[in-house]
Amino acid sequence: MEKKSLAALSFLLLLVLFVAQEIVVTEANTCEHLADTYRGVCFTNASCDDHCKNKAHLISGTCHDWKCFCTQNC
């Protein structure tokens, strides 16, 4: 009985490691670039994020050095 539970535990551990490895491999590369259509000083990440998602149709946006940068898949 002890061998069966050890085998089941080993199988579950290998399954978890395999799934975790697959998640890392399938992650997309992203690139960040200056939002050329954003106007004004970037004060809040929310306004930049809204612009990048809704106007530029990209993944997200954040403010860096008072400028809006959009994130997209490379």
UniProtKB/Swiss-Prot annotation:
InterPro entries: Scorpion_toxin-like (IPR003614), Scorpion_toxin-like_sf (IPR036574). It is found in: Secreted. Induction: Upon contact with the plant pathogen fungus Fusarium solani. It comes from the Eukaryota. One of its GO terms (biological process) is killing of cells of another organism. Pfam families: Gamma-thionin. The keyword Phosphoprotein does not apply. Gene3D superfamilies: Knottin, scorpion toxin-like. Residues 1-28 form the signal peptide. Keywords: Antimicrobial, Disulfide bond, Fungicide, Pathogenesis-related protein, Plant defense, Secreted, Signal. One of its GO terms (cellular component) is extracellular region. SMART domains: Knot1. Its main location: secreted. Pods. Disulfide bonds join C31-C74, C42-C63, C48-C68, C52-C70. Belongs to the DEFL family. Possesses antifungal activity. This is Defensin-like protein 39. It comes from Pisum sativum.
